């Protein structure tokens, strides 16, 4: 018997809480399942949004484990599991289950690696990082990289040296990946990013060619100047909205290339940015987001991107990693028993990189 800690909640009115139970590693899995000893797991904003929307009448009274991104070691393998997976394998992946007893933030995960919810499972890459372990970095990329790469590949676009990309929310984890993938995988002409003026240096180091400060500049006006003066009148092939910023929508033709050129506007947050602070929360967040998307999506190519778990993502990530210029950005690594520190920072949108929880 081993102790299995899990970071859980019951519904939106209950705070996160570590619970413990005993599990028998010899009898807790089926013939088609594996058991992963989790070494690290990472928070994403969606984890806390799901917590906040966990209506007690809809989600039931059982504890739900928070988290999706994880890394660890396989410690048990069922008899009918594909020979690709073996005891001792170091792995990382995404456990894409909503309001489930299991989630990434627990000592042991038990699952079928062929399930649609867990197909994003891959051998842990070697990152050769002097500051963080492979386990920490392995837990930092699955959700954000998957979201980003699907935004680049799902809609038939071809990117190259003539392409221009706008990232709304360049300092977010997904924004970071949009910049890196655009510059290093697709070698685009220019990436323009919006961010706080304090983040200019960081985002330019990542690869952003032009930064626009949302705290000191008028974004629509400044964007027009960049298009005219820096991009020689060429508009954007892709606008990737990681921040829920809508001020460009009324005059989208000033910024986005024509629809018949297969230009795309991709949104990953909804049209209204979610506020974790109850005093700032937007009433009707879900409905306003849905109505906003329905209202304008027909006039140009607009997509609200919903990430999918796919086995093919692992090889794509390793290809991206192989160029040697990429490490997932880490804000901090926090022991499980100090999770409240990480939660507070996530809910304030203060993280500059991934908030990783250590299970070592």
UniProtKB/Swiss-Prot annotation:
PANTHER family: ALCOHOL DEHYDROGENASE RELATED, RETICULON-4-INTERACTING PROTEIN 1, MITOCHONDRIAL. The keyword Phosphoprotein does not apply. The gene is YIM1. SUPFAM superfamilies: GroES-like, NAD(P)-binding Rossmann-fold domains. Pfam families: ADH_N (PF08240), ADH_zinc_N_2 (PF13602). The keyword Mitochondrion applies. It is found in: Lipid droplet; Mitochondrion. Keywords: Lipid droplet, Mitochondrion. It comes from the Eukaryota. This is Protein YIM1. The lineage of its organism: Eukaryota, Fungi, Dikarya, Ascomycota, Saccharomycotina. GO terms for cellular component: lipid droplet; mitochondrion. It comes from Kluyveromyces lactis (strain ATCC 8585 / CBS 2359 / DSM 70799 / NBRC 1267 / NRRL Y-1140 / WM37) (Yeast). GO terms for molecular function: oxidoreductase activity. Its main location: other. SMART domains: PKS_ER (SM00829). Belongs to the YIM1 family.
